[in-house]
Amino acid sequence: MKLGWLLLAYLALALAFARATPPLEASDEARHLGFVVHLARHRMLPVVDASRPGLAAHEALQPPLYYAVGAALVGPRRLRDAERFYVPMPGSTIGRADLPGTRFMFTPPDRPRPRGTLAAVRRLRLLSIALGAATVLLAWATARTLSPDDPDTALFAAALVALNPMFLFIGSSVNNDNLVTVLSAACVLASCRASFAPARTRDAIVAGVAIGVALLAKASALVLVPPLLYRIAAAAPDRRAAARAAGAALGAAALVAGWWVVRNLVLYGEPFATTLQAVLAGNLRPSWQPLALLREWDGFVKSFWGVFGGFNVIYADGVYDAFFLLSALGVASVLVALARPGLGRDPRVRALALLAAGNLLAVAAWTSRLLGSQGRLLFPSSTAIAVLAALGVAALPARARRVTQVAVPAFLAAASAWACLVLIPDAYAVP
């Protein structure tokens, strides 16, 4: 398979996911659209009041970049009738795939659909699909940068991203995860290609600006900071040079995204308004539970690979068993990559590992306070994870390597096709 064919497969599957999932029925899509509606109508950021949450609810506290782009793309006229979508469906089984009942969260299927909002949702989903395609390209380019003489490894890394059913599902919905994922992938590629030599402070400044832009997409981009500081420290001849470059990078990031943090501090008393967001979402745990992610690892792994709809459309257990095995093999492959002579000592590779580990720790911290262990929260480091896994597979004996590089993408493609062509359409079939 060549890169062009992989991109075509990604686009075909993503469009099929977009067609299969009814408007606003993807995870949190209604709330993300609500933020776009507010910006398109009012042309100013919302000031969130817990007593009047609005269509966006807790998502109105997200950084605004994705929604600003979306509002500019669709305009206010298409969204005049958006409220007609936000009619709760009686008997909905949100978050409970094990219960009988309808999978629809909003607007009973026999109600007339507002055409303007339908067109806006389609356009915003196409934006997300385009961002996903860019992420796939960036994953390929990152692997090519680290292993320039091995095109098969680069293609395998790109396939691990492109054919992940959950990546395709979220990537075909209205969701700011898609923007922070592609911006994180761009930061990863830039970090792998930059020298961060003491005489090139510009590299640190550019990296800081990129992270600042990513932070305006989603606060989870903070996980990009430790790998950047590590790359700077590894390239610097002494502590003074490292401090100078790190200061330049952090200063650049603060200039780009600092206003958003200050605004939150002024309005909500926290840099990212986390408490208010949890109150509005209704997912604040009664107490701090530092080991929550370990206890909920089953759902965490499942939702990295594929849990659809309002967390109420799932695969059969056998498919998840295969995903558990694939996850274990992926972790083993990452460890092999880090143990490979020469490769494991490369600061660029270590930075990728630091990003993946930092993202996992950030999710664990988030889960210790909030309900809902979602594997898709690892998507900001999905490029790093895929590249490391691909580099580990490259160390296998030739035959095992070839089999893995064919079998894994084939399984992911089959699972994705089953989800978007059978599983999701059946879940939303109207008798």
Describe each model-derived feature in a short phrase.
Residues 4, 97-115, 139-163:
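Transmembrane-helix signature of polytopic, membrane-embedded enzymes
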Residues 7-8, 250-254, 396-428:
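Signature aromatic-anchored transmembrane alpha helix within multi-pass, membrane-resident enzymes
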Residues 10, 157-162, 189, 211, ...:
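Short helix- or helix-capping micro-motifs
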Residues 157, 203-219, 224-227:
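Membrane-interface alpha helices of multi-pass inner-membrane proteins
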Residues 193, 224-254, 261:
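Perimembrane helix-loop-helix junctions
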Residues 265-339:
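Membrane-lumen/periplasm interface segments of multi-pass, membrane-embedded glycan/lipid transferases
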